C-alpha cells in the first residue's frame, strides 16, 4: 500500500472518515475531525516519506499523540530517524498549541474589557435561579471567565438557550472560573459547570472553582492543592444517573481519591426525576 494511504488509514481508524490528503513535508497540517463542530479543524498531522515513512497525528480538542510508521526500523539509524521526527513533531505541536492559547487569551481579555456587567434577568441566569456573580455580557451571551496563574486565559460564552462555547484554541485544562475568595484553612469546592458553582457558593458562602468539565476536576484540583496547600478541597461532583457509566460521578470519585480530599454528590429524594444531575438541578427542584 502507498505510505500516504496507509497513514491516512491510521488517522481514520482513530478519528473516523476524513476528507484530506496528508502532505508529506514534515510540518503540521490541520484537518476536520468527524463529529466535531462543522468548520472546525481540531485534527493535526505530520508525515515524512523519505527513508522510513513515518508520522504523528492527534487532536487539539482531545489531546494525545498517535505515532505511525510504515514498518519497523531495520537498523539503529532508522530508529533514531523516527525518534527525531517524533520529537520534532512534538515540539511543533507544543509551539502551535502555545500560540493558539496565547491568541485566545488576548481575545478573551479584549472581549472581557469590552463587555458590560451581566443582566441579572438574562434568560440563562433566570432559568438557573442564579445571581450574576461578576459575569459580563456581550450582546446576548454571558461571558464566564477562566483563569490560570491569575491571568484571564479563556471565556465560555453562554447563550440564552443554554448553548455554551469556549474561545477556539483557548486553554481549558487546569483553568477554572472562581467564585468567592479563597481563605487559608477554609473549603474550596471544585465542580463542573458555572451554574453548579454559583449554587454552591450561594448555599455555602464558600469559595468555588468551576472546572467546566468532569475531566478537568483533577487538573484544577492539583493546581489548587499546589497553590493553596492549607485550603480544604471538596470535589462537588455531578451525578449523571441516566448516562452510561455515570461520567460525572466517576470522574469526581477518581479526582477526590487522587487528591485525597472529600467528595460530595447531590442527595436525591426518592421522587426526584432521574434526568436531574447536579446541585443546581436539585435546588431548582426543591424551589418548585
Which residues are covered by each model-predicted region?
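TOPRIM fold recognition
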Residues: 1-6, 186, 202-288
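Non-catalytic accessory segments of DNA primases and related replication-initiation nucleases
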Residues: 1-123, 240, 247-250
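Short aromatic/hydrophobic-glycine micro-motifs
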Residues: 16-20, 130, 261
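A short acidic, often aromatic-flanked loop/helix-cap motif at beta-alpha or helix-coil junctions
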Residues: 27-30, 140-143, 268-277
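Phosphate-handling DNA/RNA-contact segment within nucleic-acid enzymes
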Residues: 103, 140-229
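Serine endopeptidase catalytic core focused on the charge-relay Asp
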Residues: 117, 121-130, 139, 149
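Phosphate-handling catalytic cores of nucleic-acid transaction enzymes
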Residues: 123, 132-137, 153, 234
Amino acid at each position: 500500500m502507498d505510505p500516504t494511504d496507509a497513514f491516512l488509514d491510521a488517522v481514520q481508524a482513530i478519528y473516523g472518515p476524513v476528507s484530506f490528503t496528508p502532505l508529506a513535508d514534515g510540518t503540521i497540517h490541520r484537518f476536520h475531525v468527524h463529529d466535531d463542530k462543522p468548520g472546525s479543524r481540531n485534527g493535526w498531522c505530520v508525515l515524512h516519506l523519505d527513508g522510513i515513512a513515518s508520522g504523528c497525528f492527534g487532536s487539539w480538542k482531545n489531546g494525545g499523540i498517535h505515532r505511525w510508521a510504515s514498518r519497523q526500523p531495520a537498523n539503529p539509524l532508522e530508529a533514531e530517524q523516527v525518534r527525531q521526527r517524533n520529537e520534532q513533531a512534538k515540539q511543533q505541536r507544543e509551539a502551535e498549541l502555545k500560540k493558539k492559547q496565547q491568541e485566545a487569551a488576548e481575545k478573551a481579555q479584549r472581549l472581557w474589557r469590552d463587555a458590560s456587567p451581566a443582566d441579572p434577568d438574562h434568560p440563562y441566569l433566570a432559568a438557573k435561579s442564579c445571581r450574576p456573580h461578576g459575569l459580563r455580557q456581550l450582546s446576548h451571551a454571558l461571558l464566564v471567565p477562566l483563569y490560570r496563574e491569575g491571568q484571564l486565559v479563556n471565556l465560555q460564552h453562554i447563550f440564552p438557550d443554554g448553548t455554551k462555547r469556549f474561545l477556539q484554541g483557548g486553554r481549558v485544562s487546569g483553568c477554572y472560573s472562581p467564585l468567592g475568595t479563597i481563605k487559608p484553612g477554609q473549603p474550596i469546592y471544585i465542580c463542573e459547570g458555572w451554574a453548579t458553582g454559583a449554587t454552591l457558593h450561594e448555599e455555602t458562602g464558600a469559595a468555588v472553582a468551576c472546572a467546566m468539565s468532569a475531566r478537568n476536576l483533577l487538573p484544577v484540583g492539583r493546581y489548587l492543592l499546589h497553590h493553596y496547600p492549607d485550603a480544604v478541597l471538596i470535589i462537588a461532583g455531578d451525578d449523571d444517573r441516566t448516562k452510561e457509566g455515570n461520567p460525572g460521578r466517576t470522574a469526581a470519585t477518581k479526582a477526590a481519591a487522587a487528591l485525597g480530599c472529600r467528595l460530595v454528590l447531590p442527595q436525591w429524594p426518592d421522587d426526584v426525576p432521574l434526568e436531574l444531575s447536579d446541585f443546581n438541578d436539585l435546588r431548582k427542584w426543591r424551589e418548585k
